[in-house]
Amino acid sequence: KLHIPTISTKKSVELIRAAKAEGLKVSCSVAVHNLFFTDEVLEGFGSNYKTNPPIRTKEDVEALLDGLNDGTIDMITSDHNPLDIEHKKLEFDKATDGIIGLETAFGALNTMLPLELLIEKLTLSKAVFNIKNQPIAVGQVANLTLFDPSQSYEFTEKDVLSKSKNTPFIGKELKGKVYRVLVG
């Protein structure tokens, strides 16, 4: 089986959809920021938008969302890539590619996809890699996320739990606040 990580173009969605229709064993993922932002944000050359694959056109984003909705795209990844300030506080062309995304994944996409589909694509789709989901039951390891899908908030630097702050989401209005992740 072939897994293609972090696709970002309409053409990628079309090719993977065709491959799956032919019965080929292929899976893929898309990064949160490639769903949330379009290339219009690049006009200001902010280095926190510099990532690989790059942020694409509105047409690409729409195709990626269609691919999630029809099952072509198997999972959403945070594509969490922490970088120190020395690698991001540079001119756009000299800055290192990378965005952190763990803290913003749910809130960024909560209004873009149906809640059940979003949860599936963020969590349950790990079965693509033969990683089993544990049932919520006595004696089982619990992996739980406590969240309020209706709470809107402005994402600030205080919300960044990572040591790195390389995120274009600072100052963005998000909806769907994660309060706690419990593992154990």
What function would you assign to each model-found segment?
Residues 16-17, 88-89, 158-159:
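Short amphipathic alpha-helical segments
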Residues 9, 33, 81-83, 151-152:
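Short, glycine-/Ser/Thr-/acidic-enriched flexible segments
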Residues 94, 141-184:
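C-terminal cap of metal-dependent C-N hydrolases
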Residues 1-76:
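Histidine/acidic residue-rich metal-binding segments in metalloenzymes
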Residues 1, 48, 69, 75-76, ...:
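His/Asp/Glu-enriched, well-ordered alpha-helical/loop segment
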Residues 49-59, 96-100, 167-173:
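A short acidic, glycine-rich active-site loop
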Residues 12-13, 36, 84-86, 145, ...:
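Glycine/Thr-rich phosphate-binding loops of Rossmann-like dinucleotide-binding domains
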Residues 64-66, 135, 171:
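Short, flexible, glycine/charge-rich loop motifs used to bind or transfer phosphoryl groups or to couple energy/partner
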